[in-house]
Regions:
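Sec-dependent N-terminal signal peptides
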Residues: 3-13
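Hydrophobic alpha-helical membrane segments
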Residues: 24-214
Length: 214
């Protein structure tokens, strides 16, 4: 019975309409099988988040749509790193950081506009994106802290610490499958910290003039 329910569920993912935005990526002829396999769990998540106000995302586009676009445009490996960066930034501190850099808001729901591709590349700070990325390669989270976002850096460290500890504990208990799963999650967030440090230093800086993030 459980197998039948799973089959029906995944069939529904394939034939559903555009209520769930990532479904369009699943049906897109430009997305390969690996990208679609990675986007599939995001599409499943949207069936929960889009039907519960408690799971509403503060960003526009939402983290699930952002992740789906990242995977579709950059492939599953880089796309997952980009998604991990967004997940780390989607914290209680996001609104204050958004105000600091004169970020724009999406109306009428006033979500924080944070596009995948940022067109305004003007950087008024003296922070080096490459140096920030290098710091996070050595100590995850430190690159974001260097770039001026201490709490984002702390959140990144925390995510890696949690998943890394879970992986280590699983291997200690000879739970290989669980250990491998958490190892992959740790690697994804580690990659996300490197990308996130670079992106933070390059784009998410407090402006010295009236320029906005587009």
């Amino acid at each position: 019975m459980r197998s039948i329910l799973l089959i029906v569920f995944f069939m529904n993912l394939g034939i559903s309409q555009d209520k769930y935005p990532t479904d369009t990526l699943l049906r897109s002829p430009t997305s390969n099988i690996f990208e679609k396999a990675t986007i599939l769990p995001i599409s499943a998540w949207q069936r929960l988040s889009y039907n519960s106000n408690l799971l509403s995302c503060q960003f526009y586009p939402s983290c699930s749509n952002y992740g789906g676009l990242a995977i579709s445009e950059h492939g599953p490996f880089i796309g997952l790193a980009i998604t991990a960066d967004r997940i780390v930034r989607c914290s209680p501190f996001a609104l204050e950081y958004h105000y600091d850099m004169n970020g724009k808001f999406h109306y009428p729901d006033y979500r924080l506009i944070d596009p995948l591709q940022i067109t305004n590349t003007k950087n008024n700070s003296n922070k080096s994106p490459l140096f920030a990325a290098g710091l996070s390669m050595i100590l995850p989270g430190s690159g974001r802290i260097y770039a001026g976002r201490f709490m984002d850096g702390f959140m990144g460290m925390w995510m890696i610490a949690i998943s890394g500890t879970a992986a280590y504990s699983s291997f200690q208990e000879n739970k290989t499958i669980k250990g491998n799963l958490f190892s992959v999650i740790t690697l994804i967030f580690y990659s996300g910290e490197i990308y996130g440090a670079y992106r933070t230093a390059k784009y998410y800086q407090i402006p010295n003039d009236n320029s906005d993030l587009n």
